Amino acid sequence: MAATQSEIRYLTPPSVDVKKKKYCRFKKNGIKYIDYKDPEFLKKFLNEQGKILPRRITGTSLKFQRRVAQAVKRARHLALLPYVTDLMK
C-alpha cells in the first residue's frame, strides 16, 4: 500500500510553463510622454470591461504605470475612453 501511494501516475504529464520575462515597453522604446489623446494606444492597458490592467500583467514599471493611469483617467474625463463597458475589444 505504501508503494502505491509513492507512485503517482498522471494521465497527461505535468507541464512546466516557461514565462516570458516582462519588460517595460516605455523604457525599451524610449517613450517619455504618454499621450492621453491617443485612445487606441491606451486601450492596450485596459481590459474588456474598461478597467486599467495592473503592472504584473502589463509589465510596465511603476513610474510609467502611474503615467498610464493618469493618461487613462484624463481620456475618460474627456470622453475619449469609456469608464465602464461590456465588451471593449
UniProtKB/Swiss-Prot annotation:
InterPro entries: Ribosomal_bS18 (IPR001648), Ribosomal_bS18_CS (IPR018275), Ribosomal_bS18_sf (IPR036870). It comes from the Bacteria. GO terms for molecular function: small ribosomal subunit rRNA binding; structural constituent of ribosome. Keywords: Ribonucleoprotein, Ribosomal protein, RNA-binding, rRNA-binding. The keyword Ion transport does not apply. One of its GO terms (cellular component) is cytosolic small ribosomal subunit. GO terms for biological process: translation. Binds as a heterodimer with protein bS6 to the central domain of the 16S rRNA, where it helps stabilize the platform of the 30S subunit. HAMAP family: Ribosomal_bS18. This is Small ribosomal subunit protein bS18. It comes from Parabacteroides distasonis (strain ATCC 8503 / DSM 20701 / CIP 104284 / JCM 5825 / NCTC 11152). The lineage of its organism: Bacteria, Pseudomonadati, Bacteroidota, Bacteroidia, Bacteroidales.
